[in-house]
């Protein structure tokens, strides 16, 4: 009997939610061609699963990724989401990026953001990559790596 990617993820998450005494409905979709596993969680206490700035959700996603990729020949990308958290967080970060860029232009001083995971740092970099006046770069070591927004020097692209 071949255990599917969905089965592995479902089994693992069922065990986690049982241990947490949480009632969670899972919607799982696996794209065989793209090697992408999408898991959407629904339930009453999703705030607990999201955690502070999505850290719990990110950890859960990382663990599911370890489980489904353990004996897999191809790398499977895993996304775990609930209540459109990922989309809302992306919008929040894009707005933050624009506000910080404005602050940097006004004050003419660099601004360092709070530490973020690679995915969130990439959102900030992307949001400001076409800005004429500011540039972004990451500094520090994980898990304290963060984005710094700086005023471009004259002629810098």
PLM feature spans:
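RNA-contacting regions in translation and RNA-metabolism proteins
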Residues: 1-157
């Amino acid at each position: 009997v071949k255990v599917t990617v969905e089965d592995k993820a479902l089994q693992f998450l069922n065990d986690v939610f049982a241990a947490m005494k949480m009632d969670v409905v899972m919607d799982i979709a696996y794209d065989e061609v793209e090697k992408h596993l999408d898991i959407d969680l629904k339930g009453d206490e999703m705030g607990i699963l999201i955690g502070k700035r999505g850290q719990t959700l990110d950890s859960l996603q990382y663990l599911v990724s370890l489980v489904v990729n353990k004996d897999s020949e191809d790398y499977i990308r895993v996304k775990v989401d609930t209540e459109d958290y990922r989309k809302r967080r992306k919008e929040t970060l894009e707005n933050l990026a624009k506000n910080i860029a404005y602050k940097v232009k006004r004050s003419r001083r660099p601004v360092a953001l709070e530490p973020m995971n690679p995915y969130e740092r990439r959102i900030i970099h992307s949001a400001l990559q076409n800005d004429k006046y500011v540039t972004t770069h990451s500094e520090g070591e994980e898990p304290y790596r963060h984005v710094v927004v700086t005023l471009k020097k004259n002629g810098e692209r």
